[in-house]
């Protein structure tokens, strides 16, 4: 016997073909979400170099997305192919709790990650405050924040019910009781408007920093200092990734927030378009790994190593042009060179760069103003017998 809807007045009549389309879409999101987020977790387990404090936000995002993709999406797909919600009331509450909890964690992690990027790029003096302890405390706060909002419906502040498209469960957005309305308004403000403000501020300041730096280049100071082409490419990439991340957040959660706000005023969408906000939100589990992790060279390199260990691995491959830069060995031993690497711009220098012959080594670039990048170095000696001058090519990925 089908589990009855709690609010039959808002349930939509959907054709079997539309149910199948929803089922196929959710199945694809489930497969991509499981594989993509699982790869991120494996990368953290295999490669120590990606375990920088800020990347723990990416790991947190992957864990929460993996949980809902493994446990929640199969329930949605099975219900869609059955043309109705096939699990009981307890299953509805468990599903809604898992998915809503994952959504809140994802939203707040987006906000925390964007603010950390703002500090790293625009507030270099405070960069050292982003330590592993600080990040772990922030993650604990995010999970506690999510637990508060997702446990509240289980204890009487609003409730979990089947959604208007009867293949999933969520908060009773369409409830008109005092508890339902107050909870909906509070969630929209605390879980959407507040983190969205942080994201817009952070990426807006990053863009402003880029625009101001471009303006300074056109002044007198620009005539006295040369900015390498690859640094300009990095800055453009920072701007692009910032817009990409903000757009991904808006696409995933803005339609859902709008529908939830409209539900307060008893506005109902009487066709299958009501399913789109839910589908957009659920798709975020599938594309988050590609936006937040696979734009990072370290992640990509390890994924290539995991997926194709039989191929020749080329570290640091990206779309950025590789500049030719000269380095001069300070001293040479039988196995290792300790080098000073000089760039045309004296704002940039490499700390403790060491190579063992013509091999690949990933190091850090420390730049005082304003972009911080990681450096992948591929040593290409002009003469294997020469000890005075070599060249290397470099690839940069934005932190």
From Swiss-Prot:
Residues 44-55, 116-134, 211-240, 296-399 are cytoplasmic. One of its GO terms (cellular component) is plasma membrane. Keywords: Chromophore, Disulfide bond, G-protein coupled receptor, Glycoprotein, Membrane, Phosphoprotein, Photoreceptor protein, Receptor, Retinal protein, Sensory transduction, Transducer, Transmembrane, Transmembrane helix, Vision. It comes from the Eukaryota. Retina. Expressed in the hyperpolarizing cell layer of the photoreceptor cells with its photoreceptive region adjacent to the lens. Disulfide bonds join 92-169. The modification N6-(retinylidene)lysine is found at residue 282. Glycans are attached at residue 6. The chain crosses the membrane at residues 18-43, 56-81, 96-115, 135-158, 183-210, 241-263, 272-295. It is a multi-pass membrane protein. Phosphorylated on some or all of the serine and threonine residues present in the C-terminal region. InterPro entries: GPCR_opsins, GPCR_Rhodpsn, GPCR_Rhodpsn_7TM, Peropsin, Retinal_BS. Residues 1-17, 82-95, 159-182, 264-271 are extracellular. PROSITE patterns: G_PROTEIN_RECEP_F1_2, OPSIN. It holds the Pfam family 7tm_1. It is found in: Membrane. GO terms for biological process: phototransduction; visual perception. GO terms for molecular function: G protein-coupled receptor activity; photoreceptor activity. Belongs to the G-protein coupled receptor 1 family. Opsin subfamily. Visual pigments are the light-absorbing molecules that mediate vision. They consist of an apoprotein, opsin, covalently linked to cis-retinal. This is Rhodopsin, G0-coupled. It comes from Mizuhopecten yessoensis (Japanese scallop). The lineage of its organism: Eukaryota, Metazoa, Spiralia, Lophotrochozoa, Mollusca.
């Amino acid at each position: 016997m089908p589990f009855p809807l709690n609010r039959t007045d808002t349930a939509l009549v959907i054709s079997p073909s539309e149910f199948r389309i929803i089922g196929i879409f959710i199945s694809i999101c489930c497969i991509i979400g499981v594989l993509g987020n699982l790869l991120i977790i494996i990368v953290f387990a295999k490669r120590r170099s990606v375990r920088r404090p800020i990347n723990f936000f990416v790991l947190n995002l992957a864990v929460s997305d993996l949980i809902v993709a493994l446990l929640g999406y199969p329930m949605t797909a099975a219900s869609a192919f059955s043309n109705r919600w096939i699990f009981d009331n307890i299953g509805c509450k468990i599903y809604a709790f898992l998915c809503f909890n994952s959504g809140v964690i994802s939203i707040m992690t987006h906000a925390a990650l964007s603010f950390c990027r703002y500090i790293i790029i625009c507030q270099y003096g405070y960069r050292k405050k982003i330590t592993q302890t600080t990040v772990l405390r922030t993650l604990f706060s995010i999970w506690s924040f999510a637990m508060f909002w997702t446990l509240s419906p289980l204890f009487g502040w609003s409730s979990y019910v089947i959604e208007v498209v009867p293949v999933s469960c969520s908060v009773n957005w369409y409830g008109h009781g005092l508890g339902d309305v107050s909870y909906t308004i509070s969630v929209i403000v605390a879980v959407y408007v507040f983190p969205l403000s942080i994201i817009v501020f952070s990426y807006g300041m990053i863009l402003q920093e880029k625009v101001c730096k471009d303006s300074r280049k056109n002044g007198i100071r620009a005539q006295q200092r040369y900015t390498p082409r690859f640094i300009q490419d990095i800055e453009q990439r920072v701007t692009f990734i910032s817009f990409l991340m903000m757009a991904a957040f808006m696409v995933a959660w803005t339609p859902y927030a709008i529908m939830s706000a409209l539900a307060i005023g008893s506005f109902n969408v009487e066709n299958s378009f009501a399913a789109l906000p839910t589908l957009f939100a659920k798709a975020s589990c599938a594309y988050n790994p590609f936006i937040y992790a696979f734009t990072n060279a370290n992640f990509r390199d390890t994924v290539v190593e995991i997926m194709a260990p039989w191929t020749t691995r080329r570290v640091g491959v990206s779309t950025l042009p590789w500049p030719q830069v000269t380095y001069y060995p300070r001293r040479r031993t039988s196995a290792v060179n300790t080098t000073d690497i000089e760039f045309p711009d004296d704002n940039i220098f490499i700390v403790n760069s060491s190579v063992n012959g013509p091999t690949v080594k990933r190091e850090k670039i420390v730049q005082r103003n304003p972009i911080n990048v990681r450096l992948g170095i591929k040593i290409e000696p002009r003469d294997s017998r020469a000890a005075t001058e070599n060249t290397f090519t470099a690839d940069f990925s934005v932190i």
